[in-house]
Amino acid sequence: MATSSTFSSLLPSPPALLSDHRSPPPSIRYSFSPLTTPKSSRLGFTVPEKRNLAANSSLVEVSIGGESDPPPSSSGSGGDDKQIALLKLKLLSVVSGLNRGLVASVDDLERAEVAAKELETAGGPVDLTDDLDKLQGKWRLLYSSAFSSRSLGGSRPGLPTGRLIPVTLGQVFQRIDVFSKDFDNIAEVELGAPWPFPPLEATATLAHKFELLGTCKIKITFEKTTVKTSGNLSQIPPFDIPRLPDSFRPSSNPGTGDFEVTYVDDTMRITRGDRGELRVFVIA
C-alpha cells in the first residue's frame, strides 16, 4: 500500500529506534506533528510493538507541546468549595476587627451585610430537617449588627439584667445540643460595683429549649439564668436568678424568640434575627 510504504520511509531502521527510547529520532518527532489522525492509526501495521511505543511516546510529546488539551473545568463541588472558602475569608476579614460589632460604623455594617449575603447566596438555602446536627457544638459570636446600635435586634428571652445594673459584655457563645434540644446563650460579663469595690466578673448562662420550625427557623424558649462568678469570687458555687413572673415581664421580653439559619457549615454559622439582626458565629 502507498500509505504504508510512505510511512515506513519516514521511520529509521529498527535497531536505531530500539537503541534509544528516551530521544526518538527527529524524523519521527516532526513528521507526526501536523497529522490529525488518531495516534495509533498507522503504527500497528509496520512497526514492531516496542518501536510502536517509542513512536507513540514521541507523538504524545509533539501533541502536548503543540496543541494541548484544555484544562479540566473548575465547575462543580470543587469550584463551589473554593468559592465558599474565599467568601468566608472575606466575611471574616470584614467583621474580625469590629469587636463583635460594638465599634462598627455605618460603612462597616454595609460591608458586613454585603459579604454575608454573598456567602448566603453561594451556600444556597439551608435545610436542617435532615441535618440538624450541623448546629451541634459550642459557637462563638464573632459579629452582631445589633451591637453597633446598642440594640439586641429582636426579642431576647431572659432576665433584663442590663436594665438593672451596669454590665460590660465579654465573649458570647451559643451552646447547642441537638439531642436534648438545649440551647444556651453564654455571656462573659463584668458587673459594675460601687467604689471602692472591684467589678464582679461572672459567666451568665441563659438556658433555653429550642425547636425547628420549617426548614431553617429556630424557636427558643427561655427557662432560667445561671450565674457563675470568677476571679476573686470563683469559689462561690453557681446560682440561678429567679425568673420574673409573667405580669412583671416587659412586652419586649415574652420568654421566646426565633431566628433563621441562613448559612451553616462545620466552622461557620450565619443567622438572621426576628428583626433582621445579622449574626456571625464560628465554632469554638
Swiss-Prot record:
Cellular localisation: Plastid, Chloroplast, Plastoglobule
Transit peptide start-stop: 1-72
Phenotype of null mutants: Increased susceptibility to ozone and to bacterial disease.
Origin: domain of life: Eukaryota
GO BP: chloroplast organization; defense response to bacterium; response to ozone
Chief localization: plastid
Keyword set, alphabetical order: Chloroplast, Phosphoprotein, Plastid, Transit peptide
Keyword Transit peptide recorded: yes
Name of the protein in its database record: Plastid-lipid-associated protein 6, chloroplastic
Annotated source species: Arabidopsis thaliana
